[in-house]
């Protein structure tokens, strides 16, 4: 009975989502494309150093990638906002509690993203390890002592907050798409990052061993 009611309510909510609207579809495309592109590009850089060669140094290569990722993020956020404007308004979200929740998510999500960026810096945030710019030690301070992947989690919170402030069920659907895509991206990013650091540690151990002979 509970499951049936839940399914019926989801069906009811979906009446407030225009799945054929252009900006809605473009937002999904951009959300999927962005991490797919930066993971492929970063792995190509790790294997071929093509951005390092083009830019003259690994730092400049990382800054270029950071600029491109940031620019794609702005495009994604703009498409998201444009999509919400064109979607039906869900009047049940026109409540004080929902407004307060959106403010809380804006605040906490923004703090997570900003604090993570300040801890990691440009190269730590934008895949500097793929360029050979490795962190000397694991970052353990706030917000990394609160949760794993605070930047991704904070970003999802900001999307949800924006959806609630626009009283948009479609915005929540898009936020869920962002969450799922980030989870998939992390599967590839975390495993390859571990590979980068384990390879670097093994190479360092070999050098130390050869020096001691």
Swiss-Prot record:
Topology of this chain in the membrane: Multi-pass membrane protein
Sites where the protein binds S-adenosyl-L-methionine: 107-109, 189-190
Record localization: Endoplasmic reticulum membrane; Mitochondrion membrane
Domain of life: Eukaryota
InterPro entries, per database record: PEMT/MFAP, Phopholipid_MeTrfase
Keywords: Endoplasmic reticulum, Lipid biosynthesis, Lipid metabolism, Membrane, Methyltransferase, Mitochondrion, Phospholipid biosynthesis, Phospholipid metabolism, S-adenosyl-L-methionine, Transferase, Transmembrane, Transmembrane helix
Enzyme Commission (EC) number: 2.1.1.17, 2.1.1.71
PROSITE patterns: SAM_PEMT_PEM2
Topology feature Cytoplasmic, residues: 76-102, 188-213
UniProt protein name: Phosphatidylethanolamine N-methyltransferase A
The encoding gene: pemtA
């Amino acid at each position: 009975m509970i499951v049936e009611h839940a399914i019926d309510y989801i069906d009811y909510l979906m009446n407030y989502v225009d799945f054929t609207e252009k900006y809605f579809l473009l937002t999904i495309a951009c959300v999927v494309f962005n991490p797919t592109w930066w993971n492929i590009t970063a792995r190509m850089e790790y294997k071929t150093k093509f951005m390092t060669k083009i830019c003259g140094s690994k730092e400049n290569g990382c800054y270029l990638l950071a600029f491109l990722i940031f620019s794609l993020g702005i495009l994604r956020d703009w498409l998201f906002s444009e999509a919400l404007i064109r979607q039906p308004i869900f009047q049940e979200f026109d409540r004080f509690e929902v407004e307060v929740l959106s403010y809380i998510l804006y605040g906490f999500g923004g703090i997570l993203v900003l604090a993570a960026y300040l801890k990691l810096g440009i190269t730590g945030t934008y895949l500097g390890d793929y360029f050979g710019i490795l962190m000397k030690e694991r970052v353990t301070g706030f917000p990394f002592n609160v949760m794993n992947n605070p930047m991704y989690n904070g970003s999802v919170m900001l999307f949800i907050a924006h959806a609630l402030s626009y009283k948009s069920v479609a915005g929540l659907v898009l936020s869920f798409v962002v969450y799922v895509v980030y989870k998939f991206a992390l599967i590839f990013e975390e495993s390859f990052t571990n590979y980068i650091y384990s390879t670097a540690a093994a190479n360092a151990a070999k050098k130390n061993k050869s020096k001691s002979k």
